Amino acid sequence: MPSSRIRFLALFLLFLPIQSEAQTKGVVNFGRLKNLEFIDQFYNGGTGSLGSGPGPNFGLQFTANAQTIISASKGGSGNFINNPGGNPVMFFQTGNPVTMTATNGVGIAVWFYYSALQTGSATVYAGPNATGSILASVTLPPNNSGCNTYKLCVWSAVAVPLSATAGSISFAGVPDSLAIGPVHLGSAIPTSMVLTSSQNPSVQGEAVTFTATVTATGTAPVGSVTFKAAGHVIGVVPVSGGVASITLSSLKKGSTTINAKFQGTVFTTVGKSLVQVVN
């Protein structure tokens, strides 16, 4: 092989981009795991302690005390009902927190559902196995009331936006008093919006306020709303307290379509529209 070609290949190989492993993205819903089964290697492409699996290879490692339990209403031994998705949920029977380590890290956000009889917490760490700096810590207050046959019947959503890559998340609480439902890793936090007009129809020259009310799963939305009238941008307004509004008095007679689109770094984009009638 000519020396010039060898040099070319060497340079080509030298500057090949390094392929990094993709960050973890998926839903840990505990489906296919059995009643009182330890999660073990199920979400690392392996099996649970009772042989369930192989599960999806999310590169997740769980501490040895992480178990799943099925509702008694479905033939298991769990004292709960109404869990989102109807799959088994995660719990622990020892005083140590349950920690889930993501080998490839998690970006964007973590959001999950929980049910608690006593106060618990969720702490997100930069490193594996609950090490490194704390990126976020959320209190999980008791949320069950009005339950009859089952002690746990209310499930609350909690979302944690991430400004840096997370290495692990730890769930702590009183044993047998905290249950964790589906855990969403690395995906944008779902949002919804309602767009309203202060006066519709209105009179030409009358000030009309358009209000976009934005809600997000398990947390307050952070971002801005872009308002358009007849396809033209009329303002970009930051969301405060879940609300962004803009006031116009210059709309022409007739019907004008008003559009509002919410955008946030770790939130899903959502848009709504209405037709404003001016007499």
Residues covered by each model-derived region:
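Bacterial N-terminal signal peptides that target proteins for export
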Residues: 1-8
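A generic structural signal for beta-strand entry/edge sites
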Residues: 17, 97, 155, 166-168, ...
